[in-house]
Amino acid sequence: MKRRSFLKSLAAVPAASLALPRFAQAALPKTRITRVRIYKPPDLNPLFNQSNMLVTVETEAGITGIGEGGVKDTLEQCAGSLIGKDPFKIEAIWQEEYMAFFYPPGREKQDAMGALDLALWDIKGKALGLPIHQILSGAVRNYCECYNTGNVRPPASASGAPPTVKERVQATLDAGYKLYRMGAGDPGSGPWDVRSRLLQVARDCKAAREALGDSGDWSIDFHQRFELDDALRGCKLIEEYSPYLVEDPVRDEHFLDDIPRLRRMTSVPIAAGEEWGWRWDFNKLVENHDIDYNRCTLPNVGGITEYLKIMALCETHAVGMVPHFTGPVATAALVQCLVTYPLSVMFEYNYGNRQIPYLPQYTDFKAGKLYPNDR
């Protein structure tokens, strides 16, 4: 390129740059929020005490967004302040909801804010004709690896005996999953006997590693049932079997004190956070790398708006994302977010190929993997 042509093209850059905001703004219709509806759908996970309330946010432009989470009273309280707002000013709405009312928002309000925030991002995606991962930074992976909450149960034996760990592992691998999950903190039928439970945990973990060989991974959930000394004893017993992660090894009320202590005394990767809200619940644990995986999920943290900030915090400190299972709307949103996350991702998923009657084709699941879609 000749010098004169180069200078001429360079001079045109500011004018082109000034035009970009107008072009971007033109892609979004001028509209306001007109109505928020709240629904109680069929209970998809009756064994779990988890809200699956649905919300729809309607606009003058005829675009309706769908969200999930919260309870009726809190949703109604939060929804009223949305009426008349520009649905595309998502951060401004989030900040106003966070600061509103007399008291700091608790986890119930965070969940309700998360439901409404999901609906606002849905509106934006529909207005632009783009999936959320394209509105963000674009996908860095084609799918998210999953594990099944209760694994895949093998066919019943002729004797009626319960399946062995080896049989459960094989059924899980055959279904396409690469990670087999176990629980260490199930209450059982008698008094809580920590010593015998930890010895059984060690036997099960050894059996899982032997069954998996080098073809897969295993993890175990301590379910916050162990004090620090017992958690340490359990972690030491299973270190040699190379777990993918140990989840919630200590009691929740002691997390901020005991997880850093445990971190210094064991080599197992630690995961925590399925009950956390936004970043201030755990930022120190992430910043000090006291955990390897963050289990926080949608809509609990306050929606996609907050989840993106959590992802940035975790990426900065090399912490992977392993969100707790959630409802179908939030699951679809999580997949859209996490295909943009460049570090380790593992997805807890327990719907399998089961159809959701009120939300067909909400995501694509196949052979242990969740794929984002353009719907």
For the regions a language model picked out, list residue spans one by one:
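N-terminal secretory signal peptides
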Residues: 1-2
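Conserved, mostly hydrophobic/aromatic
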Residues: 62, 116, 129, 221, ...
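Glycine-rich, aromatic-flanked loop segments that form ligand/cofactor-binding clefts
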Residues: 117-154
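N-terminal export signals
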Residues: 5-25
